[in-house]
Amino acid sequence: MVTTRSSARRTPSAELPLLDGHASGNGHANGNGHANGYTSVNGTSKKRHSNTNGVNGRDDEHDSKRQKVAEPVDRTRWRMKADDGRHTWHYLDDKEAAEKWPQSYADKWYMGLPLNLPALDPPKAPSDAVRNGLTFFEHLQLPTGHWGCEYGGPTFLLPGYAITWYATKQHIPEIYKKEIKNYLFARAHPEDGGWGLHIEGESTVLGTSLNYIALRIMGVEPDHPVMTKARATLHKLGGATHAPHWAKFWMAVLGVCKYDIVNPAPPELWLLPDWVPIHPWRWWVHIRQVFLSMSYITSKRWSCEEDDLIRSLRNEVFVEPWESIDWNGNRNSICEKDNYHPKTWLLSTANWVLATIWNPYLRPNYIKNKAEACVSNLIDMEMANTDFACLAPVNQPMSLVCCYIRDGPDSYTVRRLRERMEDGIFVNADGMMVCGTNGVQSWDTAFAIQAVVSSGLANDPRWRPMMEKALEFLDNQQIREDVKDMDKCYRHPRKGAWAFSTKVQGYAVSDCVSEALKSVILLQKEASGYPQRLDDRRIFDAVDTLLTYQDPKTGGCASYERPRGGQWMEMLNAAEIFGNIMVEYLYPECTTAAVTTLKLFQKHWPDYRAKEVSTFIERAVRWIKTAQYDHGGWYGSWAICFTYATMFGLESLATIGETYENSESARRGCEFLVSKQREDGGWSEHYQSCEEMRYVEHPSGSQVVMTAWALIGLMLAKYPDVERLRRGVAFIAGRQQPDGEWKQEAVEGVFNKSCCIGYPNYKFTFTIKALGMFAQRYPDVKL
């Protein structure tokens, strides 16, 4: 039998924090394998999804083939604490503690537990379905005014946490082990037992190798049926030598493979003058921050202490004997299923020079030390500017490893990062996973406000308390100052802005600024009686920052920053699993968000920077038209895909008065959408649209979220065929449950062209908005 790392290596100071109410205090299990005081129940819970592949489950045929639960867990004991937008999860082993802190509706919903809400009156008109939907959605609002969700989908995040915990000798509580096992067992591919890049993807070496290792860290033995099946798939795909760069990096940190198999990530690039075209400051912020920490670790060539588990893994994840592997010869080995963006000749040449000449023979120690010091300083600035939350749960565990190497296991930086890593964890009906960011708090709250306003209900006393709490949350989450020394750490201005999640995370995004500001203006200026929480100066701060996002060459908007480098930089894309990650790109979604918000702002403050605002709108819409595809649609980069972006493209045109009747661009956009409407009235698009850049129907049929996007775009463009719209509205209303809920369907979001990610609240915010808009425009039309 393979042994796991002994608990003697895990000091109490390294325990995972924030497990309030865990009876044993340190998370160790008692003699029967259960945490002290734990009462097990049947962990198989009712699924909250329809018969489609989705964030919360696969279809019924596949569902019967899935491992339901690795170890039973009493899901009534989980609580999510929302503290000023920060989400942390707590398992209350003690009965008295659980009674003092009862589960909220949101907790139960996340867990897939029954809410036992009463059935509402069946809707006769779209407005009835709107109210029913809001009645359910209101139950999910958290005390701080926002909505939480599992922002999950990518499969490489959880292994990064697991490997970091293990490599840095951090105690992993038993309840974490159980729930991680449960989640990964549930998410194994129903046919071959592997894991993909994301939860709906086919098995890859990246997903299978890393999640196999994560399960071994959690104590699953190699002869477990789930592991033997996954290992067989991994070997069929070529074994861990054929993993992409990021997986090889994590396996080198763990000591499962040697660093010679990891292509270089030279920290010396940070020493280049800023004017050099390939300097990392020009890269897209996510790849920049990942490279930052990765370059420090690979430069140190640090691996954790070897033990029995690591030695065993060396014999499990490779096809050939570990001792005979040509590590350097396999630097570029990669499974075809992982190789979405093959390395270019330029990158391969650079890697060869760095790996075979520069690093072993020419690299002076003083350059190495200087580069590591530069990177180390930038990591410190990242932690200071985010209170250790970091940009995302991708670079955060890497930063922890950096600090563990540099500062030692008991340092403040290591302890604080361990605490902050809790922010990325989410627990759902399947178990414990890691989100793509520390949440979607500000983003989802803005769309919730817009859904109510678009439905004409902002002034309805029934919904005012919900909206006032949402407004208060956006008030609290506005970022009030720029980053200290932002030029030195290459950060974009952010004063007055909003982040995707929370102000503590602090990375402003153009569309997050736009949608939050729009929502504030809608309630404070368009509706009546709402508190004026943001005064004019704070509104102006947001506009000032928003205006900095326009690309001076084209007029479009990117995401975190203006483009700093050209698309040719993709020749240096070393990730292999993603496309379009090296630099910022211009997006119809981000550009539209800015256009619509500035147009609304202009209505209420016509004199503030009037010429600049007008010029921004004019140039942005001009770019939107150039981004339209020949078939009439727009390509979406942040959700799936043409349906999503075409909604935004039509919204941009409508903002300047261009609609189906008077605009060729709007008419083509509408015709593209209606050409994709299905017989049942809905729309359906598969994530392969993002990968292949062509419209691909979802095999499971129509989806409520995509139907809502299509309807919103068509109504904004004043598409004249009301019957087509009515059929789409009837489809959405027909999927609504008696208590007002919509069940989870297929995954909604995407990033970097190839990786899906879930936005579970979209099935409320966009469906309610579509139904509400229809009810406002056609009040006499029934379902």
Per-segment meaning from a language model:
Residues 2-783:
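Preference for long, amphipathic alpha-helical scaffolds in soluble/luminal domains
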